[in-house]
Amino acid sequence: MTTLSSINLSIPPHLLPSTTNTCSSSSATSCSPPRSSSFVLHSPLSFGHRRLPISKKSKLRFCGVITKEAVSGSNDMTITQVREDDESEIDAPLLDPESLSKPRRIALFVEPSPFAYVSGYKNRFQNFIRYLREMGDEVIVVTTHEGVPEEFYGARVIGSRSFPCPYYQKVPLSLALSPRIISEIARFKPDIIHASSPGVMVFGALAIAKMLSVPIVMSYHTHVPVYIPRYTFSWLVKPMWSIIRFLHRAADLTLVPSAAIGKDLIAAGATAANQLRLWNKGVDSESFNPRFRSQEMRIRLSNGEPEKPLVIHVGRIGVEKSLELLKSVMDKLPEARIAFIGDGPYKEDLEKLFTGMPAVFTGTLQGDELSQAYASGDVFVMPSESETLGLVVLEAMSSGLPVVAARAGGIPDIIPEDQEGKTGFLFNPGDVEDCVTKLRTLLHDRETREIIGKAAREETEKYDWRAATTKIRNEQYSAAIWFWRKKKVHVLGPINWLIKRLFPVPEGNV
């Protein structure tokens, strides 16, 4: 009988999944996967020339797999259901320390540019590149061509000619499948390709990964099916989900910024639960810090009335952010002032909506100005229901601001139910009265505001970009490579079987 270990067309035997049953008959019950709590990878791998022992404590150390409970459970799924210390019965293949210490060659396809386009994932990718380079990895970045530097922390950056998104002109898109880019990536010889999704460039990244026979990881950052009804036609939602399913089923691993988004992808059939991982939160606690509080900035944000209660919103100003809700909220808080920091296609309309009201629109701020803007407010508000995580919420908390945000998308991953009222407040999406009640509590009670702001700051100090990057590099990329090798085995197995029968080896020559 042909075994996986007999396949030798292009994969060395020591890189194949072991077919040894690690469960004895007496322990079969304990080795069976619980019906409603876990997905099981049945075969550990041998890496190098020795088999790696896998202890129960290390079962999920490399990933944090989303369990079936995350799919079939209630809508109150939280980050705790995607955690490192999950006790599900999973054999996690781990690379040995020697393999992990070797530099990797990583090709990143990011659309739009994390260098020129202001968005929530800009800091995520910039810090990711920075810490990969600090770990000694070689990195090449393919992105849209506007404002692209030649290099970033030693990583080479390639700009691909882009075009504006038809329904969102400020978002540049690019297929990144020109002969020049294919040639550059082929010469680079990546160990793994990582592409942001959804978008147009991810198709180019997938094609190149297949051409070069390289594992591909896709990280999901923009919940486009939620945006579509606000920008185009609702009937396009189903075709969009079909595209997302096509892309992520072709990926070797999918990364998501929050458990809630992971749940949506699994429910839509876009990926298998055991091929989904969480990209851990991170925040630059030095750049976003209460020490940046500035009276001068507060005067600017309050339009010359720094003694008035000041509400802050930071982020892209788009119709999908539900910012029109804040008009009704501020109508009920006439004593307060509000400042919008950011730019976007909805800015002009929002300014018209707030005509005659005590609202300031600063446009895009960066560097110390942005740090000062965060730290100089009293409360941060986030009405958006479409956030895959909400990095601006983390930045506000790191700046010592209490947050009032919609209980939607990835926000409950940042302020879980057991932390509501301690590190921030969540309100029911679209509920003006609920939002007003929680804002008023904070705006008029300085002591409560300071206690929650301090607790929020302490909470965000747990989140570190270096640790998040290390986890992806050492554990989640390793998982992607393992799934990719496993997929190749499944493809080559029937071919190997056919060759053995067409060209049998005489017994005397074995």
UniProtKB/Swiss-Prot annotation:
Molecular function per GO: UDP-glycosyltransferase activity; UDP-sulfoquinovose:DAG sulfoquinovosyltransferase activity
Record field: catalytic activity: UDP-alpha-D-6-sulfoquinovose + a 1,2-diacyl-sn-glycerol = a 6-sulfo-alpha-D-quinovosyldiacylglycerol + UDP + H(+)
Gene Ontology cellular-component annotations: chloroplast; chloroplast envelope; chloroplast membrane; plasma membrane; plastid
InterPro entries linked: Glyco_trans_1 (IPR001296), Glyco_trans_4-like_N (IPR028098), Glycosyltransferase_grp1 (IPR050194)
Membrane topology, from the record: Single-pass membrane protein
Subcellular localization, as worded in the UniProt entry: Plastid, Chloroplast membrane
Transit peptide, UniProt annotation: 1-83
Keywords: Chloroplast, Glycosyltransferase, Lipid biosynthesis, Lipid metabolism, Membrane, Phosphoprotein, Plastid, Transferase, Transit peptide, Transmembrane, Transmembrane helix
Entries under Pfam families matching the protein: Glyco_transf_4, Glycos_transf_1
Phenotype upon loss of function: Lack of sulfolipid leading to reduced growth under phosphate-limited growth conditions.
Membrane spanning residue stretches: 198-218
Signal listed as a keyword: no
SUPFAM superfamilies in the record: UDP-Glycosyltransferase/glycogen phosphorylase (SSF53756)
Factors inducing expression: By phosphate depletion. Repressed by phosphate (Pi) and phosphite (Phi), with a faster suppression in roots than in shoots.
EC number: 2.4.1.-
Family: Belongs to the glycosyltransferase group 1 family. Glycosyltransferase 4 subfamily.
Chain's role: Catalyzes the transfer of the sulfoquinovose moiety from UDP-sulfoquinovose to diacylglycerol during sulfolipid biosynthesis. Sulfolipid contributes to maintaining a negatively charged lipid-water interface, a requirement for proper function of photosynthetic membranes. Sulfolipid may also function as a substitute of anionic phospholipids under phosphate-limited growth conditions.
Record-given protein name: Sulfoquinovosyl transferase SQD2
Source organism: Arabidopsis thaliana
Taxonomy of the source species: Eukaryota, Viridiplantae, Streptophyta, Embryophyta, Tracheophyta
